[in-house]
Amino acid sequence: MLAKRIIPCLDVRDGQVVKGVQFRNHEIIGDIVPLAKRYAEEGADELVFYDITASSDGRVVDKSWVSRVAEVIDIPFCVAGGIKSLEDAAKILSFGADKISINSPALADPTLITRLADRFGVQCIVVGIDTWYDAETGKYHVNQYTGDESRTRVTQWETLDWVQEVQKRGAGEIVLNMMNQDGVRNGYDLEQLKKVREVCHIPLIASGGAGTMEHFLEAFRDADVDGALAASVFHKQIINIGELKAYLATQGVEIRIC
């Protein structure tokens, strides 16, 4: 069995790490490189960086910090933000990123997933899915351009359909960003994760809602996700990664202990 992964997420805007609640009202957390270094030293299995306004601004992720991160950490990291071409991806990988993640550009042009996978290998290609539960309809819908609340829009895709579509097109991993839970720290949406797990046959990463160590355990034990991504509990030092992993190990979760 592959070890489960603990993945801090760093949302980047204007060269700073920021964090919002339900993808809104972002506050500045701090500088990118020191935070990345701290998480690597605490025992993170990998890091994910989202340039949250790159797609909505119509630009590729600002690459100036990618090589600086690569110099100070020795764990894999993934970069996302406005990657719309093979050239965009090649540049980011050449600066030292191990994976690239696409979200809004994949919705705009699903063939991009296949072209990236063919060029760089499926192991490099992550698809992020921003999913919102509509209580009125009881359905999960995929959202686009979520980095800018004034431009965020609901797409025609229901989440489970899009999960299956991106797999067919060559995604190597899916990060499921559950927008209703984002930043509120009351637990991952286990019901949604279980539904996605049933149709997702590639690595699945849960994102949105972690507030306690038990929330991570529930995601691994009850929804069988491959990794759990979190931001605010790590940024605000509510949970220490090393202590979290020790706890998970005592609960029988296969985890890499530093």
UniProtKB/Swiss-Prot annotation:
Gene3D superfamilies noted in UniProt: Aldolase class I
Pathway(s): Amino-acid biosynthesis; L-histidine biosynthesis; L-histidine from 5-phospho-alpha-D-ribose 1-diphosphate: step 5/9
Pfam families: His_biosynth (PF00977)
Top-level enzyme category: lyase
One record GO biological process: L-histidine biosynthetic process
Alphabetical keyword list: Amino-acid biosynthesis, Cytoplasm, Histidine biosynthesis, Lyase
Source species, domain of life: Bacteria
Residue positions of the active site: D11, D130
Location within or outside the cell: Cytoplasm
Gene Ontology MF terms: imidazoleglycerol-phosphate synthase activity; lyase activity
Swiss-Prot/TrEMBL catalytic activity: 5-[(5-phospho-1-deoxy-D-ribulos-1-ylimino)methylamino]-1-(5-phospho-beta-D-ribosyl)imidazole-4-carboxamide + L-glutamine = D-erythro-1-(imidazol-4-yl)glycerol 3-phosphate + 5-amino-1-(5-phospho-beta-D-ribosyl)imidazole-4-carboxamide + L-glutamate + H(+)
Assigned GO CC terms: cytoplasm
Enzyme nomenclature, EC number: 4.3.2.10
Subunit structure: Heterodimer of HisH and HisF.
HAMAP family xref list: HisF
Family stated for the protein in its record: Belongs to the HisA/HisF family.
Stated role: IGPS catalyzes the conversion of PRFAR and glutamine to IGP, AICAR and glutamate. The HisF subunit catalyzes the cyclization activity that produces IGP and AICAR from PRFAR using the ammonia provided by the HisH subunit.
Stated name of the protein: Imidazole glycerol phosphate synthase subunit HisF
Name of encoding gene: hisF
